Amino acid sequence: MIPDTATQLYQRVEALADLDSDAVEVRNRSLHAALAQVCHEGVKDTGMAFGNLFSQVDYLCRSRAVGAADRQEIQTMRRHSNSTEPIADADWPYDLRALALLVSAVTSTDVPSTLVGRLPVMGRPADLSHTIDRRYLRCVVTDHDDQFIHVHADGDGTGDTYTVDYTAHSYLQPLLKRGMQLNLIDCHEGKHLEPGLIIVEPDYLLDISQIARCFTDYGHHPLAYVANRLSPAANSYAILLGNFAGRALDDIINHPTDYDWLDTLRTNFRERALDYCTCPDFAGGATFKVDAKAQVDNLCGIVDNLFAPDPASRRRPYRRDRAILEPSFVCERLGIQGRIDLMTTDMRLLVEQKSGRNYNIERGYANQYGSFQKEDHYVQLLLYAGLLRQNFGLGRRKTDIRLLYSKYPLPGGLVAVNEYQTLFREAIALRNRIVAQDYAIAHDGFGSIIDQLTPETINERQLSTRFFSDYILPQLQRLLTPLHTMSAVEHAYFCTMATFVMREQLAAKVGSNEGVSASMADLWNMPLATKREMGNIYTGLTITGKEKSKGRGGWDIVSLDVPDQGEDFLPNFRPGDSIYLYAYTDTPNPTGAILFKGSIVAMSQHSITVHLNDGQQNEHILADSTYAVEHSGSDNTFTANLRSLSELIHAPSDRRQLLLSQREPTADTSRRLTRPYSPTYDDTLLKVKQANDFFLLVGPPGTGKTSMALRFMVEEALYDPDASLLLTSYTNRAVDEICAMLTEAGIDYLRIGNEYTCDPRFRDQLLDRRVGETPRLDLVRQTLLSARVVVATTTTLQSRTPLFTLRRFSLAIIDEASQILEPSLMGLLTHIDKFVMVGDYKQLPAVVQQPAALSQTTDPLLTAIHLTDCRNSLFERLYRREMALGRT
């Protein structure tokens, strides 16, 4: 910075020091103006967008390596300049000293001698009353009143009872229950514990992105979280563009000299061909290319800026070779988990990318936080930063956090933000309210909240803008109104099944019987010795090979050597299992590691091969180290089941009545088979053809029902030139058997799914293989529309619901149907004209974690339709009804 500028800024400090002692009323205003000028000079050439002085001061102090004590002094000065209260005489000289220190840091010059003698040599005396005595304490609530929580410490080695003053967290009062677990974070210990943060049921991890999604212009009510989970799976032009931009960021960072954006476009389209073809507002390939290229151009400039040295800064540049994309983290301390868009492995940089519109940037209007980021994006970034701080013991100033808006070029496209603690605490409070709500639903039933699940409740701020009234409100009404117009049996069914799903989710997250049922919380609660004894962890792994499954993509196939795991080790893993892969030094600790999420491809006694969900293009990331593999968890299945139940309630009345046994299935006995197939099966095949709504085929395993009866049903159905068939089952093994039958019969089919859970013999039938290396939208759509037989697991179909917006199937055949729980099928069956279930009601039902007493129901409305236990399949319920009516 030129000397003249430094001189001018110091002269402003001198002018402030020359103010008359009685000019108290102008101190704040004058100090604020001088501070604004200093900050402007410091950030004007950074190429980044800043909002209020808080974020500017924060950035300048960190980039100029200002010490922690001086940084605190400068921020105190900033707060004083913003205050409506006149700056006190005792504070004034210290504030001027802080301003001079900031000028010195920004201009890289020494404070002139003309000022040295007029300013304090040291900062203001520290307030010693605010030291933190306990960083973390896990405890259990024994009692509480309006001011204090009485807790029993768990795991601090003392077993002591503490009294916690929670007056700063009064919103917790209606949430607290005896026996509830809490994490107390950053406690000040005096007469009582005063925690900085209180985390309710911390083993129940919530996804950060889902918490952030609840922050809207109309409020952030915890019931918005429930509404979001009931909403149809989103597939839009903006989402597709965002997925492309995320892939482009990865490619740009890792191919600085030979990047070709068309490679990214082709790869992204091939991987998401189904989403592109079923997107309802896709504007066409030409328009998408223009928008995608604009995102790429902006990203190239932003990435260059992000990793370039800053001549005006003492900050070391961020290292491109330490950049990592899409790493996962679990944080038991805060009860959250998430996947970060971009960070460096030294934790110095954290970036969240957004590709959509930001009206604050477009209009140049700062938000209520004095900056340009959207609130939900801000919440997401703050929670990620808090997660890193808790997991890795980072200081608050260790990590620089940025929001990358790839729709906009610099400076608007890269927003430096500060760690605004008020909003962070608000986000944690919402997390606590959501968790308490989920526990209440699991305990009291979904019916306990359904009356409050309305647009009026979710619109906390009673917003009535035109945008809300014309766009948001109709969406909420379409989603929620059917919940309040259900018939009595529909209401009983929906609430009972939704409660069942929520209880399964609770068991999957925290366990229903410690030491017996598996749960996500085993990652940090289960001792290492127990993990080994139960076969729930591989340790001491070393990488023996890395492969790229997709050309210029990342290394996503990782082979690891498995050393001796102990004499009695029996792995509780199998191919297809979802896992975390992470490095460690001494003891495996998933909460203190960067996690790579993936699935097991192959395993033997001495080796294991995993496929990473997000391949790493940076060769330095998966380096020589010692690795562990553990089971990972996800809310996807439970969210899909809730969404499936919602689809049922939104289905046409005739369909709801059929699936809930409120109308009889019909048949057309005039239909005849087109040809004889086998004396053993012809009578059954004729009944299948004559059925209009559904047919149940009962047969024990090994009777040839899949290889013969299913084949004949498919062949007969395909005689109708307008027929379209969907063949499905719960397991990939069963779907592989279906594919084998179709292949042997010479029947063409299309398989939807993941190649690493598909038998290699049938991978050529996968959609991304069929569309080739240079896919075209029209050809992909034609492939989907012309495929008369589509094969997939029920889990895959639940995650690919946009398929049903493109086409409707005339017949679905569901194999091993007695192993599939009702919530997993109901949504699927609303998109099918007719279905055939093949199964055996005598087989054991699907594995359920909650106690049998909780899954049973005695509601007469449900027992009347033969629903007595939610752990039984739809196949069994319908079979029992047909038996009772004598129709078998």
Where are these regions (language model features)?
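Amphipathic alpha-helical interface elements
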Residues: 1-112
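A helicase ATPase "motif cassette" and its flanking acidic/Ser/Thr-rich regulatory loops
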Residues: 118-151, 242-246, 419-575
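Conserved ASCE P-loop ATPase motor domains encompassing nucleic-acid-directed helicases/translocases
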Residues: 137, 144-172, 182-184, 508-658
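Mg2+/Mn2+-dependent nuclease catalytic core
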Residues: 153-177, 318-432
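Pre-ATPase regulatory/linker segments immediately N-terminal to the P-loop/RecA-like helicase/translocase core
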Residues: 212, 221-224, 409-410, 418-437, ...
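A non-catalytic, helix-rich entry segment at domain boundaries
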Residues: 248-325
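Walker A/P-loop NTP-binding motif
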Residues: 706-720, 737, 741
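Conserved helicase motor core of SF1/SF2 NTP-dependent helicases
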Residues: 719-723, 729-731, 744-746, 781, ...
